[in-house]
Amino acid sequence: MSERMVRQFCQMVQIDSESGNEARFLAWLLDEVRGMGAEATLDGYGNLIARFPAVGSTTAEPILLSCHADTVKPGVGIEPVVGDDGIIRSAGDTILGADDKAGIAEVLEALRTAPVRPPIEFAVSRQEEVGLLGVKAMDFSLLTAKRGFLMDNDTLETIVVGGPTYVTLDVEVKG
């Protein structure tokens, strides 16, 4: 893990973004990805969609990398601390906010350092922690990638290639 990625992760978790209150973080991220050369916007729901051009590859199809911006509670006033063991923890009574700002930090670092890459579409949704509301409202017409990766796993060195579907049911009980 690079020092730059650790610094940026610590910077990101200090920007409050509990579910429903992600606007400040997403505005920061929008400026960040534009500064890295992306064409980027917020869709009508406030989800971030960014397109990064290919590097060293002109024929590859775009790949989607996806994360979410929101955190669970308590996620206001996070103070990250890097321990002597190299592990980043919250200094107080808050969560750390690694879910999913660690994924965002990984994507940003990969985009900065990859010597060759296909075009990348980067989608960062709002309100994942409260029922995937941002993804449900995302403007998919802004995306062209046919393949993608969700950067929201809790196990290092593991790739999840499938998972259960998110389903909601409305049940009416009579009697």
Where are the regions a protein language model picked out?
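Conserved alpha-helical elements of sugar-nucleotide-dependent glycosyltransferases
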Residues: 25, 106, 165
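Short, well-ordered beta-strand micro-motif
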Residues: 49-53, 150, 172
